[in-house]
């Protein structure tokens, strides 16, 4: 009987834990297309500046202050800032916190941005 209880408990835990690992991100999506306007390298990483267009935020100016992971030459963390001005002249700004990885010559960033319009954007 004790084995039956353990089996039922194990099954319940396995079934419940799999739903905790799955979630769906919903909401508005948009792409940012832009141009790198500056790169400054340091011994610990560097700073990248870019300008582009980002959906409802209009023309955006972005900065990534990147640090290297001491155990990997192809990943690290970053902080940054962003500012956008839409077609109506409205200005929004935000703080960026995230991680990055490099594959060949392409750097991909993943961040959570806290924006002055009250949104918290999950960015890739």
Residue ranges and their predicted role:
Residues 1-8:
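Bacterial N-terminal signal peptides that target proteins for export
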Residues 21-124:
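Beta-strand-enriched cores of mature, soluble protein domains
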């Amino acid at each position: 009987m004790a084995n039956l209880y353990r089996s039922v408990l194990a099954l319940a835990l396995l079934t419940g834990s799999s739903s905790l690992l799955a979630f769906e991100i919903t909401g508005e999506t948009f792409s940012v297309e832009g141009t790198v306007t500056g790169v400054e390298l340091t011994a610990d990483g560097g700073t990248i500046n870019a300008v582009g267009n980002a959906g409802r935020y209009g023309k955006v100016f972005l900065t990534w202050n990147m640090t290297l992971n001491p155990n990997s030459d192809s990943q690290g963390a970053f902080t940054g800032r962003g500012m956008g001005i839409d077609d109506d002249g409205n200005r929004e700004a935000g703080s960026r916190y995230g991680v990055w990885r490099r594959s060949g010559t392409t750097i991909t960033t993943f961040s959570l941005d806290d924006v002055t319009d009250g949104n918290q954007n999950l960015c890739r």
